[in-house]
């Protein structure tokens, strides 16, 4: 009562009433907020308020000489008043319009080059298609996305050096341009920007947009590639989405997409080889994506995906500390655990040795189509809050979390034996055994889990064992939420180690990744992936193996030929012949190999029977472990095009066809390259044609090193001796003549001498 009297008393004074009714801001904190600091607190209001003034812009004094005081309509363009606190002039927005219409023109040739990213964006939007708007609840989760389409992938430091070199070439300061991409970009930009009149600062800023990946942590539902993110504000709101198809693709998105496909293919292939880690490294180093070496892309590209991270770990690069299980990325947000080996019995009384995590922990789980928060204790799921695009996605997340919890009722829900194997036919580890089992059929798991009554909590509902939603009951500890769980935002990278089976561990020994986690999804790469490694020949099927094997022999014919005559066993063991074995029927591989090796031995022993085409044709068959038998073959079978096709031992066939006149080899109708036979192969003149200018001294002499090919002879100095491999696969010792006059007689004597040297 007293307070009210006091207030009435105050209000009776006219000054009080005036202050309270006329002054809008009456709170010190608010006044402080809007008046302290240089940061503009309400930029859009400030802009509107400024633009409502007559002269909201300041300009350099020179403007008064270049722009008239009034325009054609008689409106004043600038004020004679100076700007307070600077020696600039106050200018009307109309002056800008006048300048744009009547101001001086400069060359516009550099604009599309400097503002390349903007011009390209306009093109993408022009050709993009906007579809209907749908109103529905948007489950958005914050993900780290690329907001800058069309960039290269240089690090900030690399880009800085390039920009300094292009924009301020004469500035002092050490700049080291080392990487291939730095040098290429610098050269290209220097040429493009010759005589450029645009302010260097602007050029530098625009170059940065082109060279460096910029990422932001944004709420997204739907596409995350940069061409979708640039229109995020047009395609998704809180309760609506608009369908959109970009009007063009950008290289950075294509690289990200192709990198993931290449990495998945490589990890899958490496996992089944004898030494997975060595194979993986060999393939990463010999693969190109869109003409750039894969290892260079891996060093610069921050894409986080299981296969990509395994490749990075193998190269000794740092990766994210989160771990992967069942296709979900787990990040521990609190708690800790210790690991202990325990033996558990499944519902089928099979013993599983499992590393049990003891202790209370909380995780976020982020997958492609669902996200969740998981709280667990030792072998017990305390709570799981899931959100997902659809019922199927929610179910996937629940299965992964149930298996991860290691609960007893999950282990007991196993029906039948667990014997899942990976691509290399090795048994999966117990946790992945369980995962595969329930991914196939989770009915028993869900039925046995148990259900509970639930309280009504805003934004959450229950889910029953048959995946129907309910507000009364739910599977124990499990709720479905409308809100998504944000991806882990940190870009922190940690040092990891990798073992030869491609299991990646952090420094405390926790497994972060393994080949089991690599997705089996097949996609078509946007950029050409060139796998030079023979291990990847089979990726495009049997025909590709066949063509690649023969192309490899032809490309390396000079060395292959020497090995064929001197060290055949080493040649037969070459890994390049490994993929070919899968084309040869298993039952007969050994016999074919024995037969071909015997045939080759005869060729080495009998003068004049060396036959380039035949050696190339049959060589891959000799790579299998040979079985000695008396069997002779006139044709050998390979399994391509879904059936057995024949390669004739003597003569051409649709599989292997050599055209003597054009010297072209075609495999299954595809060109496999040019095959240069030894001159006049199989005729006695071969030696003379080859050995002009050399004197034949006799049989091979090991003291003079390994046999050279005919092509390598030209490097000999006059009077120098060497062993040389001649047409028939025989090796003789020769000396380069000291005088050129006697060359003619060499041809006649060569034949006789070779016969003597060999026999």
Curated annotation (Swiss-Prot):
Its main location: virion. GO terms for molecular function: RNA binding; RNA-directed RNA polymerase activity. GO terms for biological process: 7-methylguanosine mRNA capping; cap snatching; DNA-templated transcription; symbiont-mediated suppression of host cytoplasmic pattern recognition receptor signaling pathway via inhibition of MAVS activity; symbiont-mediated suppression of host gene expression; symbiont-mediated suppression of host mRNA transcription via inhibition of RNA polymerase II activity; viral RNA genome replication. It holds the Pfam family Flu_PB2_3rd. Keywords: Cap snatching, Eukaryotic host gene expression shutoff by virus, Eukaryotic host transcription shutoff by virus, Host gene expression shutoff by virus, Host mitochondrion, Host nucleus, Host-virus interaction, Inhibition of host innate immune response by virus, Inhibition of host MAVS by virus, Inhibition of host RLR pathway by virus, Inhibition of host RNA polymerase II by virus, mRNA capping, mRNA processing, Viral immunoevasion, Viral transcription, Virion. InterPro entries: Flu_PB2_2nd, Flu_PB2_6th, Flu_PB2_C, Flu_PB2_CAP-bd, Flu_PB2_middle, Flu_PB2_N, INV_PB2, PB2_helical. Transmembrane segments: none annotated. One of its GO terms (cellular component) is host cell nucleus. It is found in: Virion; Host nucleus; Host mitochondrion. The record marks 627 as: Mammalian adaptation. A motif (Nuclear localization signal) lies at residues 736-739. The keyword Secreted does not apply. Belongs to the influenza viruses PB2 family. Plays an essential role in transcription initiation and cap-stealing mechanism, in which cellular capped pre-mRNAs are used to generate primers for viral transcription. Recognizes and binds the 7-methylguanosine-containing cap of the target pre-RNA which is subsequently cleaved after 10-13 nucleotides by the viral protein PA. Plays a role in the initiation of the viral genome replication and modulates the activity of the ribonucleoprotein (RNP) complex. Influenza RNA polymerase is composed of three subunits: PB1, PB2 and PA. Interacts (via N-terminus) with PB1 (via C-terminus). Interacts with nucleoprotein NP (via N-terminus). Interacts (via N-terminus) with host MAVS (via N-terminus); this interaction inhibits host innate immune response. This is Polymerase basic protein 2. It comes from Influenza A virus (strain A/England/878/1969 H3N2). The gene is PB2.
């Amino acid at each position: 009562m007293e307070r009210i009297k006091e207030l009435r008393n105050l209000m009776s004074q006219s000054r009080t009433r005036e202050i309270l009714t006329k002054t809008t801001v009456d709170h010190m904190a608010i006044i402080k907020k809007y008046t302290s600091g240089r940061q503009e607190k309400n930029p859009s209001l400030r802009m509107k308020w400024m633009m409502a003034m007559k002269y909201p812009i300041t300009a350099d004094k020179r403007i008064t000489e270049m722009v008239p005081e009034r325009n054609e309509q008689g409106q004043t363009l600038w004020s004679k008043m100076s700007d307070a606190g600077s020696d600039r002039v106050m200018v009307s927005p109309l002056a800008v319009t006048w300048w744009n219409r009547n101001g001086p023109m400069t060359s516009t040739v550099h604009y599309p080059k400097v503002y390349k990213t903007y011009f390209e964006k306009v093109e993408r939007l022009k050709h993009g298609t906007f579809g209907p708007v749908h109103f529905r609840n948007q489950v958005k989760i914050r993900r780290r996305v690329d907001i800058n389409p069309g960039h290269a992938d240089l690090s900030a430091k690399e880009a800085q050096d390039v920009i300094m070199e292009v924009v301020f070439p004469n500035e002092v300061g050490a700049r080291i341009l080392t990487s291939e991409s730095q040098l290429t970009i610098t050269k290209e930009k220097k040429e493009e920007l010759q005589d450029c009149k645009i302010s260097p600062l602007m050029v530098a800023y625009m170059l940065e947009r082109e060279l460096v990946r910029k990422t932001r942590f944004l709420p997204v539902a739907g596409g995350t590639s940069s061409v979708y993110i640039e229109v995020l504000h047009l395609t998704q709101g809180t309760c609506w989405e608009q369908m959109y198809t970009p009007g063009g693709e950008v290289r950075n998105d294509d690289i990200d997409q192709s990198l993931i496909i290449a990495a998945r293919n490589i990890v899958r292939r490496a996992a089944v080889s004898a030494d997975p880690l060595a194979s993986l490294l060999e393939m990463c180093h010999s693969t190109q994506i869109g003409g750039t070496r894969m290892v260079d892309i891996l060093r610069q590209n921050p894409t986080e995906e299981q296969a990509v991270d395994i490749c990075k770990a193998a190269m000794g690069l740092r990766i994210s500390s989160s771990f992967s299980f069942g296709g979900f990325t787990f990040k521990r947000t609190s708690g800790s655990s210790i690991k202990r080996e325990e033996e558990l019995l499944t519902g089928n009384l099979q013993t599983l040795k499992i590393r049990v995590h003891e202790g209370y922990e909380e995780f976020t789980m982020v997958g492609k189509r669902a996200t969740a928060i998981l709280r667990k204790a030792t072998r017990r799921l305390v709570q799981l809050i899931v959100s997902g695009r659809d019922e199927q996605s929610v179910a996937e997340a629940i299965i992964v979390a149930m298996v991860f919890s290691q609960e007893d009722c999950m282990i007991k829900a196993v029906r039948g034996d667990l014997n899942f194997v990976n691509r290399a036919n090795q048994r999966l580890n117990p946790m992945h055994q369980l995962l595969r089992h329930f991914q196939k059929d989770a009915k028993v798991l869900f039925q046995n889990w148990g259900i509970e009554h639930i309280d009504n909590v805003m934004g959450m509902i229950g889910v029953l064992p048959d995946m129907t939603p309910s507000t009364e009951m739910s599977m124990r500890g499990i709720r479905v939420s409308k809100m998504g769980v944000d991806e882990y935002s940190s870009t922190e990278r940690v040092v990891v180690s990798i073992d030869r089976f491609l299991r990646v561990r952090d420094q405390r020994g926790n497994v972060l990744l393994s080949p089991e986690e690599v997705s089996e999804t097949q996609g078509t790469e946007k950029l050409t992936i060139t796998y030079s490694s023979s291990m990847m020949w089979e990726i495009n099927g049997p025909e590709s193996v066949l063509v690649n094997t023969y192309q490899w022999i032809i490309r390396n014919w000079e060395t292959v030929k020497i090995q064929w005559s001197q060290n055949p066993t080493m040649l037969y063991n070459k890994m390049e012949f490994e993929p070919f074995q899968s084309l040869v029927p298993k039952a007969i591989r050994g016999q074919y190999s024995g037969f071909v090796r015997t045939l080759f031995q005869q060729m080495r022993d009998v003068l004049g029977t060396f036959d380039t085409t035949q050696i190339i044709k049959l060589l891959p068959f000799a790579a299998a472990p040979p079985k000695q038998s008396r069997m002779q073959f006139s044709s050998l079978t390979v399994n391509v095009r879904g059936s057995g096709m024949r390669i004739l031992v003597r003569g051409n066939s649709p599989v292997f066809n050599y055209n003597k006149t054009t010297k072209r080899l075609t495999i299954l109708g595809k060109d496999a390259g040019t095959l240069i036979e030894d001159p006049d192969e199989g005729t006695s003149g071969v030696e003379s044609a080859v050995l002009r200018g050399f004197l034949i001294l006799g049989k091979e002499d090991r003291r003079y090193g390994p046999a050279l090919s005919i092509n390598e002879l030209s490097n000999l100095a006059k009077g120098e001796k060497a062993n040389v491999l001649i047409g028939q696969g025989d090796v003789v010792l020769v000396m380069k003549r000291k005088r050129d006059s006697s060359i003619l007689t060499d041809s006649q004597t060569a034949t006789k001498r070779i016969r003597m040297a060999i026999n």
